[in-house]
Amino acid sequence: MGENLLKEIEKGSKMAVMKKKIITHYIYNGSSTITDLAREMDLSVPTVTKFIDEMCEEGYINDYGKLETSGGRHPSLYGLNADSGYFVGVEVRQFSINLGLINFKGDVVQLKMNVPFKAKNTPESLDELCKLIKHFLQKVSVEKDKILNINVNLSGRVNPDLGYSYSIFNFDERPLTDVISEKVGGYRVSIDNDTRAMIYGEYMQGVVKGEKNIIFINVSWGLGMGIIIDGKIYKGKSGFSGEFEHNFGYENEIICHCGKKGCIETEVSGAALHRILLEHINNGENSIISNTKKNLEDLTLDDIIDAVNKEDLLCIELVEEIGVKLGRHVAGLINIFNPELVIIGGALSRTGDYLTQPITTAIRKYTLNLMNRDSVIVESKLKERAGIIGACMLSRSKLFE
């Protein structure tokens, strides 16, 4: 059913384009009356009624029942039919992947979190990823022909429009989307940047409550930024926006994974925290990690976060130092973008106030007062689910926007 509409949209007929706009309206508004929809789309009520009747008959739209009003006729509410299509999201992280399935309305049907996987820029790693995706597809409880798209989140530079990744899985001349599609059984596939997916997840189902100008700071093993301007994800010309972590920040002679020296990420990231903590421990400073982790080569970011939340003083101090540094750089972003909302997310945000309070203090210190008054600093509501929820939501929105 949904596949038929997508084929219509690809042909570009006026009817299909109008149906696409109606679906997009319901993606962002949930439900509405025909009168409200006609006003929003600047069309006559009879024209919209014709489209809605046809889409109800085709199974894309449902009549949700009468809207309770104070008097007169009670208009009907319409919205998306949950069962007319499904969308898969895949979040690729450093040492695991998350997979999810949503229905046409955007309700989460299934999530599978923290599936072991090591992301490497090798054909073998890509093959393993595709095997995990295929296994998930085999286990989901929906008809396979109702799965309309699979969206994969990746870190680094991603061109979502062309389907190319430039930081990982970039060894094939073909678009990565084509390669993955071939390996998982011919499904439609899209890709996007991991932090853009996080901000979209928060925008659709998280902490965002009507704000239209938002920055999301992803502090995980690396560092990243997602941007929404006037209610739309900002990608830049080729999809590379948000790479502020590779701005020059420090005269430290540390070579970043991008190949340049002194990038912000070399001092402000989970990788930086990991490196600095090991330096302190090797210099003889005390930490519960020294007692619980016999082989420091196996130390993970999760181990450090657990130590912070167990009130390990050394780990707390180092997280706070990173918070101060990050706050200075975010202050600069606020001065540039003047956002309504700044969301702090990613793995390190699980340390809570130990990270966010120093960030907030530094922002107050280094932003212009007028800018500071406009911006609210909040923690991610979806936490570790932000990326996978965003991946699923992008899987849907990419087909209808």
Where are the language model's segments positioned?
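ATP-binding/phosphotransfer module of carbohydrate and carboxylate kinases, centering on a glycine-rich
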Residues: 1-73, 77-113, 117-145, 260, ...
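Hydrophobic beta-strand positions
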Residues: 101, 157-158, 227
